[in-house]
Amino acid sequence: MICAVYKSRRKAESYLFVEKRNDFERVPEALMDMFGEPQLVMMLPIEKRDHLGFADIKKVRSELKEKGFYLQLPPPVVNLLEQHKKEIGFNPD
């Protein structure tokens, strides 16, 4: 299976994988509104891959077959200062 990978112009580091190039029929309208106009990044032979960046390749394959698309969002931003404060037990109160 070769899937098409698109990036969002509205949401940084957000990618939409679809089964066929320019085929967004199975992608919910609300998701497309949030995602914005998709920009093609690459065509990807997904069956030949055993890993895929930040995404779980098995989940990508499964969702493409079941839903017709897979949405990859960026990992949450970690506030390193707040994390460090918690680790050392800092409490400003």
Swiss-Prot record:
Domain of life assignment: Bacteria
Name recorded for this polypeptide: YcgL domain-containing protein Shal_1837
Family annotation (SUPFAM superfamilies): YcgL-like (SSF160191)
Stored Pfam families: YcgL (PF05166)
Domain annotation YcgL: ranges: 1-85
InterPro entries per the UniProt record, alphabetical: YcgL-like_sf (IPR038068), YcgL_dom (IPR027354)
